[in-house]
From Swiss-Prot:
Key words, A-Z: ATP-binding, Cytoplasm, DNA damage, DNA recombination, DNA repair, DNA-binding, Hydrolase, Nucleotide-binding
NCBIfam families noted in UniProt: PRK00080.1, ruvB
Biological processes per GO annotation: DNA recombination; DNA repair
Family to which this protein belongs: Belongs to the RuvB family.
SUPFAM superfamilies per record: P-loop containing nucleoside triphosphate hydrolases, Winged helix' DNA-binding domain
Biased composition (Basic and acidic residues): 40-49
Superkingdom of the source species: Bacteria
Binding site for DNA: 338, 343
Protein name from the UniProt record: Holliday junction branch migration complex subunit RuvB
Enzymatic reactions: ATP + H2O = ADP + phosphate + H(+)
GO molecular function: ATP binding; ATP hydrolysis activity; four-way junction DNA binding; four-way junction helicase activity
Record function comment: The RuvA-RuvB-RuvC complex processes Holliday junction (HJ) DNA during genetic recombination and DNA repair, while the RuvA-RuvB complex plays an important role in the rescue of blocked DNA replication forks via replication fork reversal (RFR). RuvA specifically binds to HJ cruciform DNA, conferring on it an open structure. The RuvB hexamer acts as an ATP-dependent pump, pulling dsDNA into and through the RuvAB complex. RuvB forms 2 homohexamers on either side of HJ DNA bound by 1 or 2 RuvA tetramers; 4 subunits per hexamer contact DNA at a time.
Biased composition (Polar residues): 19-28
Amino acid sequence: MAIVSSKSPDPAERRSQAKTKPSVSEPQDSLVRPQAAPEESQRPEDQIRPQRLADYIGQPELKDVLGIAIAAAKSRQESLDHLLLYGPPGLGKTTMALVLATEMGVQCRITTAPALERPRDIVGLLVNLQPGDVLFIDEIHRLPKVTEEILYPAMEDFRLDITIGKGQSARTRSITLQPFTLVGATTQIGALTSPLRDRFGLVQRLRFYEVEALTDIVQRTARLLNTPLDQAGAEEIAKRSRGTPRIANRLLRRVRDYAAVKAPGPITGAIAATALELYNVDPCGLDWTDRRLLSHLIENFGGGPVGLETLAAATGEDAQTVEEVYEPYLLQIGYLQRTPRGRVATPAAWRHLGYEPPQASGQLTLQQLLTEPET
C-alpha cells in the first residue's frame, strides 16, 4: 500500500500538483496535547502505525463495523463506501484510513481541508485517483464551500461537474472519475453541513482509550523502537496519556530519552514515573497549564462558578484555547463542570491539587447552578 501525502503549502507545488499546591514553575512545551507535533510525522522511527486491522489496538466496535464493510466490498469487488470518522484528536483516524487502504490493496492519498483552498486543488486529487483508492481528508469540517460542492457529485456519482468560462458563454463539462473511497476525519462533526455529512455511507465515532488498551499500544511501540519496557512501566505511561494513543507514544519517547541518559536498562514503573514528573505530567495526565487553570479557579474564585472569559483572563489564556484545548480533558475526568453560571471545580479537582473541598452547605445548589445564567 502506497501512502501519498498531498499538501499544497506554496503555489509552485500546486502547479506540479497542530494540600499540595500546584507547581508554579514555568512549563515546557506540553507533552499531553493531542495535536500532532511536526516531528511526529517526519522521523523514520516514528512510523509505528499498524498496517492491518488485526494489528489496530482498541476501538472494537469500529473494527467490527469496518471489518464487515471491507469483507463485503471485497466480495463484490467494489470500493468501500465513503467513511466519516469523528472524535477527539490523536485517537487514530488517520491510522484507520491507512489500514483501510492496506486491507483493500489500494493507495491512500492524504490531505487536509485547509490545503484545498481552490477548486483545482481537489480536482487535481480526484482525477488522479486509481480505482478503489482511498482519499483521506483531515479536518474535513474546514473545507471551503466551493470545494465541498465539487465533492457532492464526486461522492455520489463519481463525476466531476466543471464550469468553463463565465457569463453567457459558460458551459459545464462532466468528467467521469474512477470509483474511490473518501475518508473524512473531524473533531467537530456538528460543523459539517448536512449535504456533506449525508453523503457518507458510514459514520463512526472514535472514543477515548481505556488504560488497558493504551498499555498494549505502549508495549507494541516499545517493541518497534527496540526499547526494553516492563509491564509496570507501560501502565505508568498509559495512565498519564489522557486516553489518547498519540500522547502515549509521545510520552514513551520522552521516557525512553530519560532512561537512556539517567537510568540505562529496562524502563520500570518507577523510572517512567520519575521521568514524567520531570516533564510536568502528573499521575492523572495533567500538565502545568491544566493544574494552573484549576488552581486559579479554586484559589481566586472559590472553585466557581466563574465565566469562561473571566477564567481565561485570570490565567492569561485565550478563551477559545481554554474551551477547546484545556477543558475537554478536565471535563472528561470529572475535574471541571460547565454550568449556565460558569465553570466549577469539582471536589475531585480540589482533592487532586491538595485542597480541602468546601462543605456542601456553603455551596450553591445544583438547581441554582443549572438555572442561573453565566456571568
